[in-house]
């Protein structure tokens, strides 16, 4: 991935399982936020996202990428620029910060809460999910192992992305904020090599009624606080033959813990 540590390229496993559930999978959306400690208006977007998460619990997971602006951002990772530039290229954007993309596609939203809420409502209507996501994560010392588990209700091809994020970072200044500021959802690493995720089942379609798993490993950075970290797994689909991908469902858990499939 874009960072200091090596990520293993483990083979995907296929396990036949009985569904045991009725109805569709619950749809959880991914908010991709671009921010910077040097951005005066960025706290407004963070507040909008916090408001939405409070009013719609468990509907939106947020991953926050820090970029350099008006100086160096200590939480910057290389993936931030690569993804930001690609999003600006593919979708309408103004080239500035803050920037927000729901489920990794669609036009850029700056910070307006009502626009994000409208986009979420439209997403559920226009892009309903047909798959579920579960997570197993293990932490031994500074070694992390994450297993993404995916089941689909239809025969379809998917990709996946695994993020390691950290909450509760208070040691860094934030422009536009008074006094002590808490940085949450900070992306420490993306456990992938492709901006649009890694292929599930070697790029072959998933069969309905079977579970597919993919594993990634990483080494924690020395200044990361593991107790404040989470794992976010996003599963991506394409409606244009693989030219672009969007997040069709996601899930999250505390680092070292697990999360089961979510159903309506």
Question: Where are the regions a protein language model picked out?
Answer:
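N-terminal targeting signals for export/organelle localization
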Residues: 1-19
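Local sequence-structure signature of Cys/Sec-based thiol-disulfide redox active-site neighborhoods
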Residues: 20-67
